[in-house]
UniProtKB/Swiss-Prot annotation:
S-adenosyl-L-methionine binds at residues 243, 281-282, 309-310, 368. Coiled coil: none annotated. Keywords: Cytoplasm, Methyltransferase, Mitochondrion, Nucleus, S-adenosyl-L-methionine, Transferase, tRNA processing. It catalyses: guanosine(37) in tRNA + S-adenosyl-L-methionine = N(1)-methylguanosine(37) in tRNA + S-adenosyl-L-homocysteine + H(+). Monomer. One of its GO terms (cellular component) is cytoplasm. This is tRNA (guanine(37)-N(1))-methyltransferase.
């Protein structure tokens, strides 16, 4: 999984009946797992015939007499008076084995028919039973329980926290419990400063809170595998849905320029869809990881990596693509073989190979550096100056779509954010774009503007993706 919170079926301890909640120790600063242990006195219905357990369970479930506590199996083993092991069913906490007044008509009926016998049962609960939310709620101060820290990002075996200041005194406790409760996690880190505060490569300073000091991860996304040192590249698991959304806008055989490609979360999945991509990133380690991902996911024919400055890459790549030698990728159909013999299965008629010819113009530009990507738009004016005859209306070739990621202030009225984004884009490309230019709006429909709300980064910070067709006045401008 790519991002996570506490397990969806893990209720907060306040949702459990009092008698099933863990012991409380709000002075704990070093995790003591042995402290979290308690015995809960219950009653159980011992079933005389083990073969009758399913029927009795169904009847007691229907009468709502069974114990209903998340993650607890109500079927238990008990010994009868002769020492024989029998199956028993734990009953709801209000039922008392020695008080018939607490028995339902169904329990009384089953006892009278000799199908069950009422027995006391001491249920032992320990640290392994309770969830992260249960345990941490028994440690944090009561005034911090309204919003316990349980939003995290998982990258491979690493859990990445971004703890608020009030939880820092408990950071090691939080990390240890999270590692215990998520078996695939081996390392827990906490971001100590904002992304990019110390590096132009969008990495961030962190502290190790629990587990191994090993950030070499294996990450899967869109059926692709990426291997990288999480401390040296940018990766955000919360963006998988957005990566998928944009890649789905690209068509087979199209040409994409991924200007700030990172390790390739757009480029490599696009290559798998038989989309040509020139993918660039300034980070040398990110470039190396992208090279590995291209090879590992077998998209060498479609994805070409570069290690350049983004602004330089925008201008250079447009000219280079137009002048470089043509490329054709041939995909031969897979040979079908008989499962038993392994022999080749003849197909009539035999399927033809697929051929994909790399375009000489980009159909899409992707600019996924939300903090500063809009600033790089000033590389587009004049990008195809003097090449007007190669584009519509003279040919069928349209100017490219630009997909630029950015942050805005998360206004109460989203239109204010859209106005802000359009103004910033307009300033950089020297051409006015307004929210009315959106598809179906009252403005300039040739712009094909759409502004997609990607995610809320913080209460006052929203991430957007603005997509628009590069205006002819910009592309052909003489500069």
């Amino acid at each position: 999984m790519d991002s996570m919170t506490d397990s969806s079926n893990s209720l907060r301890s306040s949702d459990l009946p009092e008698m099933f909640r863990p012991p409380v120790n709000r002075a704990m600063r070093v995790l003591d797992r042995s402290f979290f242990r308690k015995t809960v006195p219950l009653s159980a219905a011992a079933v005389f015939q083990n073969s009758d357990i399913s029927k009795v369970r169904a009847e007691l479930h229907k009468s709502r007499d069974l114990l209903a506590v998340p993650r607890l199996n109500c079927i238990r083993d008990v010994a009868d008076q002769e020492g024989q092991i029998k199956k028993a069913l734990l009953l709801r906490e209000t039922v008392k084995h020695d008080d018939k007044e607490t028995w339902s008509p169904k329990i009384s009926e089953l006892v009278e028919k000799g199908r069950i016998a009422m027995r006391p049962y001491d249920l032992t609960l320990d640290y392994d039973f309770w969830t992260y939310a249960d345990i941490i709620s028994s440690i944090l101060p009561e005034d911090e329980l309204q919003e316990i820290p349980q939003g995290f990002t998982q990258v491979g075996h690493v859990l990445h926290l971004n703890l608020r200041e009030q939880y820092l005194p408990y950071k090691y406790l939080i990390a240890e419990i999270l590692k215990d409760k998520n078996k695939v996690i081996r390392t827990v880190i906490n971001k100590t400063e904002d992304v990019g505060s110390h590096s132009e490569f969008r990495t961030f300073p962190f502290e190790l809170l629990a587990g191994d000091n090993d950030l070499n991860v294996v990450q899967h996304e869109q059926d692709c595998e990426f291997r990288f040192d999480y401390s040296r590249v940018y990766w955000n698991s919360r963006l998988e849905t957005e990566h998928r959304r944009l890649v789905e806008k690209f068509n087979k055989g199209e040409m994409v320029c991924d200007v700030m490609a990172g390790v390739g979360p757009f480029a490599v999945p696009a290559g798998k869809k038989k989309i040509f991509v020139w993918a660039n990133d300034l980070n040398p380690h990110g470039y190396e990881v992208m090279q590995d991902a291209i090879k590992r996911n077998k998209v060498e024919g479609f994805v070409t990596p570069f290690n350049m400055d983004g602004r330089e890459f925008i201008r250079w790549s447009a000219k280079e693509l137009l002048e470089t030698e043509p490329v054709t990728v041939t995909i031969h159909p897979k040979v079908r073989r008989d499962r038993k013999s392994g022999n080749k299965v003849e197909q009539a008629p035999p399927p033809h190979p697929e051929e994909y010819h790399r375009p000489v113009f980009f159909d899409h530009y992707v600019m996924n550096l939300p903090a500063t990507a809009i600033e790089f738009l000033d590389a587009f004016p004049g990008i195809y100056a003097g090449k007007e005859s190669l584009f519509a209306p003279h040919t069928s070739q349209r100017l490219p779509m630009v997909h630029v990621y950015c942050f805005s202030g998360h206004s109460e009225n989203e239109l204010d954010d859209h106005i802000d984004i359009c103004q910033r884009i307009s300033e950089r490309i020297g051409y006015t774009i307004t929210p009315e230019d959106r598809i179906g709006g009252s403005g300039n429909q040739s712009v094909e503007l759409s502004i997609h709300n990607v995610r809320l980064v913080s209460p006052k910070k929203q991430m957007f993706c603005a997509s628009f067709r590069l205006p002819a006045e910009v592309a052909f401008k003489k500069v």
